[in-house]
């Protein structure tokens, strides 16, 4: 579970992070904070995810220590290799389809996605515009999972949408 909230001020972000951390701990779900190392440290989050214009993975590792999860966004093989070299535990790669959730996200080809998965030794998570209608198109790219927002939160029945997308993703990854 990753908390990515760009609109909240620091105090409200901290309040939200504490509530979500409590839920994640209850259900044994790792909790990663997007781009805010200080709040991750304050609430003892399981890790931090940073983008290309955020703090470098090596600096995040120095602040968090060896046991926390560090994820890095990447759009190229070069960025992916550099993130791995600097201590990233996983990569978030995309946008693999057009997305409205992140206006500045540039689409990457599935060929680039596959090249990234072949170049690195750490897990690659595809992100961006993924839905139950298109997740199977990622088969053969080498990803180990997906990250979504709208695919579940835009649905009326979030629980059912999550179950269905999880099943489709597992089938796609195993194919």
Residue ranges and their predicted role:
Residues 5-9, 37, 150:
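Structured beta->alpha junctions
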Residues 13-35, 52, 57-75, 104-132, ...:
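Alpha-helix-loop-beta-strand connector modules within alpha/beta enzyme cores
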Residues 43-45, 50, 73-114, 118, ...:
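Glycine/Thr-rich beta-alpha phosphate-binding loop at enzyme active sites
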């Amino acid at each position: 579970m990753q908390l990515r909230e760009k609109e909240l001020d620091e105090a409200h972000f901290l309040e939200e992070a504490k509530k979500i951390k409590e839920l994640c701990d209850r259900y044994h779900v790792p909790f990663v904070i997007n781009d805010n190392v200080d709040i991750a440290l304050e609430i003892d989050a399981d890790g931090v995810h940073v983008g290309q214009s955020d703090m470098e993975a090596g600096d995040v590792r120095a602040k968090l220590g060896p046991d926390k999860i560090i994820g890095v966004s990447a759009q190229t093989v070069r960025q992916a290799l550099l993130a791995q070299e600097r201590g990233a535990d996983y990569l978030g790669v995309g946008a693999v389809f057009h997305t409205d959730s992140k206006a500045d996200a540039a689409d990457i080809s599935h060929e680039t996605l596959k090249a990234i998965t072949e170049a690195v030794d750490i897990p690659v998570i595809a992100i961006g515009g993924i839905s139950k209608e298109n997740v199977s198109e990622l088969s053969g790219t080498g990803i180990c999972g997906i990250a979504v927002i709208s695919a579940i939160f835009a649905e009326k029945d979030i629980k059912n949408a999550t179950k269905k997308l999880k099943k489709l993703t597992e089938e796609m990854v195993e194919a």
